[in-house]
Amino acid sequence: MSLFEARLHAGHFRSLEARSTLLDSYARVLARWPVPYESRYVETRYGRAHVLASGPAYAPPVLLLHGGGGNATTWIHNIERLAGSLQVYAVDIIGDAGRTEGRRPASEDAYCNWLEDVLIGIGRPKLGLCGSSFGAWLAAAYLRQTSRRVSRLALLAPPNLESMRVSFMARAGLALTFPSERMVRAFQAMVSSPLAPEPPPWAMDDLLVRWRCQRGHPRPPGRMSDADLRVLPKQTLLMLGEDEALYDPLRAFARVQALAPHVRVELLPGAGHAIAYDQAAKVDDALVEFFRRDGWTL
């Protein structure tokens, strides 16, 4: 990559050195990936998108979309179980802390165009789509535009089922502005359930690198409208944690049930916003059962 290209692709990092530091951390986490994987790139109109592919080729294909400020390696706590039963594609979302090229999109349409290109590039007629937090917002936004490439939709702790609490926004803003170890650890504790296990030291080290090396995170999406909820596909699984920090999970649960009774909604005890880590085994089992339920599209 030329210096010009490096500067172009480093736009959402604090510096070229920060980008290099983050990619080194990415490689260290990937070295712990517990299953065989293929690292590949697919072409999009915004630059190449990086994808980690794991799991048997004959299994139901599923694309994973990570949370804001993360990358494909943040699924490391789930990949062993998922890749045992599914063909998993974990993509680095554009404009975030991974290997995907291109600047952070400025609009919902641009994000959806990018995701459309990724789905085309993977080359499967249809895939299951699973998003966590910001990735759940992106998955739902894409399905509002088209469902022709998606067989099933799983949403883990969507950030916009209700308006975000002011206290959460304030804590997140402080941690982004002053990403000291104390601040980032406090924020991590807030988004996790008090019953969740402590992240291993290497995972916290990677989290600190990601917070310190980026120019902020993707902008929080606005609250899902009643119409947005009503048009969620019939084959949708939505999982929330009882200790959700962004909003009242009971209120969100009731809202989805009232407006989208066709959606399967689960409320997990012992899980916060970081639901895929806090209750990894339960989330993994639910995802495998959901995406394998009626067979798959080859």
Enumerate the language-model features and the residues they cover.
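Flexible "cap/lid" loop of the alpha/beta hydrolase fold
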Residues: 137-144, 151-179
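Conserved alpha/beta-hydrolase "nucleophile elbow" surrounding the catalytic nucleophile
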Residues: 68, 127, 131-136
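Conserved alpha/beta-hydrolase catalytic His-Asp/Glu region
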Residues: 164-169, 177-236
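Conserved HGGG/HGGXW glycine-rich cap/lid loop of the alpha/beta-hydrolase fold
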Residues: 50-98
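Alpha/beta-hydrolase fold catalytic core
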Residues: 1-60, 86, 125, 292-298
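Catalytic active-site module of serine/aspartate enzymes centered on a nucleophile-bearing elbow/loop
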Residues: 263-298
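Conserved loop-alpha-helix segment in the C-terminal half of the alpha/beta-hydrolase fold
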Residues: 237-271, 277
